[in-house]
Amino acid sequence: MSEAGGRGCGSPVPQRARWRLVAATAAFCLVSATSVWTAGAEPMSREEKQKLGNQVLEMFDHAYGNYMEHAYPADELMPLTCRGRVRGQEPSRGDVDDALGKFSLTLIDSLDTLVVLNKTKEFEDAVRKVLRDVNLDNDVVVSVFETNIRVLGGLLGGHSLAIMLKEKGEYMQWYNDELLQMAKQLGYKLLPAFNTTSGLPYPRINLKFGIRKPEARTGTETDTCTACAGTLILEFAALSRFTGATIFEEYARKALDFLWEKRQRSSNLVGVTINIHTGDWVRKDSGVGAGIDSYYEYLLKAYVLLGDDSFLERFNTHYDAIMRYISQPPLLLDVHIHKPMLNARTWMDALLAFFPGLQVLKGDIRPAIETHEMLYQVIKKHNFLPEAFTTDFRVHWAQHPLRPEFAESTYFLYKATGDPYYLEVGKTLIENLNKYARVPCGFAAMKDVRTGSHEDRMDSFFLAEMFKYLYLLFADKEDIIFDIEDYIFTTEAHLLPLWLSTTNQSISKKNTTSEYTELDDSNFDWTCPNTQILFPNDPLYAQSIREPLKNVVDKSCPRGIIRVEESFRSGAKPPLRARDFMATNPEHLEILKKMGVSLIHLKDGRVQLVQHAIQAASSIDAEDGLRFMQEMIELSSQQQKEQQLPPRAVQIVSHPFFGRVVLTAGPAQFGLDLSKHKETRGFVASSKPSNGCSELTNPEAVMGKIALIQRGQCMFAEKARNIQNAGAIGGIVIDDNEGSSSDTAPLFQMAGDGKDTDDIKIPMLFLFSKEGSIILDAIREYEEVEVLLSDKAKDRDPEMENEEQPSSENDSQNQSGEQISSSSQEVDLVDQESSEENSLNSHPESLSLADMDNAASISPSEQTSNPTENHETTNLNGECTDLDNQLQEQSETEEDSNPNVSWGKKVQPIDSILADWNEDIEAFEMMEKDEL
């Protein structure tokens, strides 16, 4: 399911076009297997590689020979009973049988494999059999998706290599595009499926009667999967380029355009199934496995084959979302498209094994190595990759139909790195197939990988893909009779020539008005990767990535619980306590993840904590996670009577600022209430010690001034008491997390220490690192800096008053917490301090992480002149919050002389906002029914 290469110099390419093809596809060349390899595995000798390659040839002969002897012209071989599987003559297997159309499926699917394996005589015989025996006008209902990738793709792959062999002058001299004519006939038979208002095809079609006729027995379906509708462009475009009939590519493009338009705009993810008439998402979970996988694959490969930049832009947008939400290295977990920080399930399916290969094509090697290694560890535990397995690597669905996706990714990782480790992985696959799946009449699928029981099936993709990738893994360039890098692999591993990008380009590229997400794609200036850049002077690079994952499966197994105290004595860090947790601390988030606790930023600006014990790194971590959640509930109970406070302002009033710089500050739940008392004005001075956690050693420096204190090491209230005792008239706590900012993080408020704080009489405010650095820089530049602590900006000079109207008092809305679920426990959470007490304000079962909405700056003129504009704010992860967040009162956070700076994101059209809002409402309603 991934790209083979792309030097663009295939034999069928005219010389005048060759340079254009090279220029168009050079970025997608996979480096040769002579690349730098990691020292973790000994290089495999040419003799051993040749031996393994010959073993693959023998295995193919065993499978293909038994199909031809015992099953042909049936679609597939039943290897346990040594007979063919004919539609209607065997008990129905449901949707699986929709791939069977009484068109000798396995033979067509195997055509180009014969050429790759250098079985040219057998290929010529097979083509003659297809032309003589195969009938495409059968009264049978088939899957549009499966028929496209297996039959249409097989015919086109066979045609591509037939004309290559004919040009070489030895074989196929009689061939006159007969396979192409069959492909065109099949293409026209599939076109009626696109007769929908959306342009998305029906999932099934009758080869003889089409759609919606009484005798068709199909056409009443309303839903299709995203991959089913989005995995057509390669085959349909190739058919158009080969024949000049543009209608096929046009229909496939229209389907892709519709899917792109229907993506969830805030997450840029797509669901699993969609209504083909309305475009509504039916299943709103999203991942890279079954139901979606090849949609992403075909966006990138369509760019390679067709050279249309829009496909690459779409892929990059989706890929950014995948890596942001779905990728949890080394895992790839499905999420909800409207709540992408919330996992939709706790298991993964085997089809995602193709994704590391696609990442190689993208040029993102590190996560490809990580996920591939995780999958390999699962295989070593179960001999094969189960159809689905849980996040702790237990079997969820025990079947294994001899899927080739893992072999595919193994091949492309070897091509990209030249690491002999992947040859050893391939050797393991060969050994397992022969040891556990081989039967006298072929290779049988595994009914249960735990018991080794078989199922009487050998799917056509086993011959189309598995043996192709395994042979290419061990073959040297001279072992293949053509240059494999002149072709692109379809999702069924059929070969389409890259020179099609310069042929019959009459189809105009649709000028879509859709906006693409601006992405920092600097990490992928090359695609595929140059190992000399990726592994500079470090032959152990790939091994260093794999090493931590070597025992990932075994470590997930249940084991006796070690006493926590003993683990502390052995040098392990104590578990994260709820009172120390800070939502903006990456280290804390990593600890939560290890404990199986997910921090989810919801669209309404709230934060949700969810614990899944099975996702914890170990049983001890799961226990720590449960303790953490219980502590959160206790903190909520302790702080329930505390009030939520609006943001405050720190205004620099000394020369040369004169009130022009106003910084958004977080309030304290103790000390002088600036909304009820006069503002505090004074010069600032740094405290010693900088964290203010002990008696100050420089009381003379802070006497009568506003003390600057570093966050951390003790409670906020303790800091306040220490600077108050030193004579300070106020305090500003500056965040110790470098880079934190009020325009990218929610408002933070400082809580007390659970004791009586009436003794604290001075005002205390909190500044994030970015805002705090402005004051520190001003001190370095001007030495004496005077600030005003207030509930809102005041005393601006006349020039500033002319530029900007006085800001209205900020209200703090929607600062109630979010539910946190741990087993049957639910609590509401608010922003908490690292190493200080949490701000907890709500009912007894609620806990606030103070105002999870950002303090954005919108000038009064903007608020009045554009009442319908959506000024999006940003949560901790940079994720856009939803429309209801925008209704929150926004505080001014100016840091320059322009008073009208808005920290909001770019404006969306109101129709788009309302459409996404309606989708979110539907998703929230549906979420109540989800099993999480």
UniProtKB/Swiss-Prot annotation:
Span of the annotated motif Prevents secretion from ER: 929-932
Family matches, as SUPFAM superfamilies: PA domain (SSF52025), Seven-hairpin glycosidases (SSF48225)
Binding site for Ca(2+): T491
Entry keyword Transferase: no
Cellular localization per UniProt: Endoplasmic reticulum lumen
Keywords: Congenital disorder of glycosylation, Endoplasmic reticulum, Glycoprotein, Hydrolase, Metal-binding, Signal, Unfolded protein response
Metabolic or biological pathway, per its Swiss-Prot or TrEMBL entry: Protein modification; protein glycosylation
CDD domains linked: PA_EDEM3_like
Catalytic reaction annotation: N(4)-(alpha-D-Man-(1->2)-alpha-D-Man-(1->2)-alpha-D-Man-(1->3)-[alpha-D-Man-(1->2)-alpha-D-Man-(1->3)-[alpha-D-Man-(1->2)-alpha-D-Man-(1->6)]-alpha-D-Man-(1->6)]-beta-D-Man-(1->4)-beta-D-GlcNAc-(1->4)-beta-D-GlcNAc)-L-asparaginyl-[protein] (N-glucan mannose isomer 9A1,2,3B1,2,3) + 4 H2O = N(4)-(alpha-D-Man-(1->3)-[alpha-D-Man-(1->3)-[alpha-D-Man-(1->6)]-alpha-D-Man-(1->6)]-beta-D-Man-(1->4)-beta-D-GlcNAc-(1->4)-beta-D-GlcNAc)-L-asparaginyl-[protein] (N-glucan mannose isomer 5A1,2) + 4 beta-D-mannose; N(4)-(alpha-D-Man-(1->2)-alpha-D-Man-(1->2)-alpha-D-Man-(1->3)-[alpha-D-Man-(1->3)-[alpha-D-Man-(1->2)-alpha-D-Man-(1->6)]-alpha-D-Man-(1->6)]-beta-D-Man-(1->4)-beta-D-GlcNAc-(1->4)-beta-D-GlcNAc)-L-asparaginyl-[protein] (N-glucan mannose isomer 8A1,2,3B1,3) + 3 H2O = N(4)-(alpha-D-Man-(1->3)-[alpha-D-Man-(1->3)-[alpha-D-Man-(1->6)]-alpha-D-Man-(1->6)]-beta-D-Man-(1->4)-beta-D-GlcNAc-(1->4)-beta-D-GlcNAc)-L-asparaginyl-[protein] (N-glucan mannose isomer 5A1,2) + 3 beta-D-mannose
Assigned protein family: Belongs to the glycosyl hydrolase 47 family.
Function statement: Involved in endoplasmic reticulum-associated degradation (ERAD). Accelerates the glycoprotein ERAD by proteasomes, by catalyzing mannose trimming from Man8GlcNAc2 to Man7GlcNAc2 in the N-glycans. May also participate in mannose trimming from all glycoproteins and not just misfolded ones targeted to ERAD. May have alpha 1,2-mannosidase activity.
Involvement in disorder: Congenital disorder of glycosylation 2V: A form of congenital disorder of glycosylation, a genetically heterogeneous group of multisystem disorders caused by a defect in glycoprotein biosynthesis and characterized by under-glycosylated serum glycoproteins. Congenital disorders of glycosylation result in a wide variety of clinical features, such as defects in the nervous system development, psychomotor retardation, dysmorphic features, hypotonia, coagulation disorders, and immunodeficiency.
Name of the protein this chain belongs to: ER degradation-enhancing alpha-mannosidase-like protein 3
Native source organism of the sequence: Homo sapiens
Organismal lineage: Eukaryota, Metazoa, Chordata, Craniata, Vertebrata
